[in-house]
Amino acid sequence: MNDASPASGTPVLDVWCELQCPDCRSALDDLRALRARYGDRLELRLRHFPLEKHKHAFAAAQAAEEALEQGKGWEYVEAVLGRVEELDRAGEPFLVEVARELGLDAEEFDTALVDGRHILIVDADQAEGKAIGVTGTPTYVIDGERLDGGKSQEGLRERVAEIVDRLLAGQG
């Protein structure tokens, strides 16, 4: 998932995430800090990696793609991650409610979840993640380097920043 269209040569941080994952919620602060620091000089790209242990994760990934299609991908992701417990309790109706709260077309959202129009995107992300060794979320990939998050987020923001700074310095 990618809301932006960065200039070519912009470093890309792939964020393998799952919207029912408490560790991904914790990682939001790091992602916000990286966006604040780099702005358009870093492309953050959400990659879906729904885990079987979270029963609403696959639907949430599809919902995030529908939100992207309607123009509010990252806003939606942040809203859902900020309320993981509600997703745990309410499931798909919660996903549609968040869309409504953000001013998205909730009816179209519901239809997208029923007809599965975004399943192939989610499946492709998950397959690619498995192929490169992603086993849990969050996992970051930048410049070919995989950085595993999960319960130990400490130091990841700094490590990503080191790599981005190195890549940006190489462009000058």
Predicted regions and their residues:
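Structural alpha/beta surface segment adjacent to cysteine/selenocysteine redox centers
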Residues: 12-100, 170
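A general structural-boundary detector
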Residues: 8, 50, 63, 82-85, ...
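Solvent-exposed, flexible loop/coil residues
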Residues: 5, 53-55, 138, 151
